[in-house]
């Protein structure tokens, strides 16, 4: 078996870092995401607005996920623990990304995703970013302005708390 040279390994690592950095293209901070008249997994006939989904909190964790996405499935129980924590500072709202409502609803129930999950069937929400990979989590205020974002799954409750609090 042939081994990669140090130069080849460095080139592959640089390419991987470049691709990871391009997962959410463009400068997202300060961008406003419009969520209006959207259906949810729990109520496909609903026409939900971002402010309604905030549930009285000033910050929203908008999490793009799919039932097909292994890192998403690993992250959902952690987000569920955050939601169940004593005083979460943000409301979690899911966006079903490149997925159908049926598999999404099954995965949400199986993994404990009890929060509202928007059905982005036409990709209109994801196109505003644009989302190129999942999971992607945006920290929004109630006006839909992106305060911060994370590409890839959170690793701990402490990481989620630090992300929401801006530390």
Predicted regions span which residues?
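Short active-site neighborhood of thiol/selenol oxidoreductases, capturing the structured segment around
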Residues: 51-73, 79
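Hydrophobic beta-strand anchors of alpha/beta hydrolase catalytic cores
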Residues: 61-62, 92, 137
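A generic structural signal for alpha->beta connector loops
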Residues: 58, 89, 114-115
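N-terminal targeting signals for export/organelle localization
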Residues: 1-42, 153, 157-167
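Structural detector for helix-capping/boundary residues
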Residues: 31, 35-36, 67, 132, ...
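Structural microenvironment flanking redox-active thiols in thiol-disulfide oxidoreductases
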Residues: 73-111, 121-127
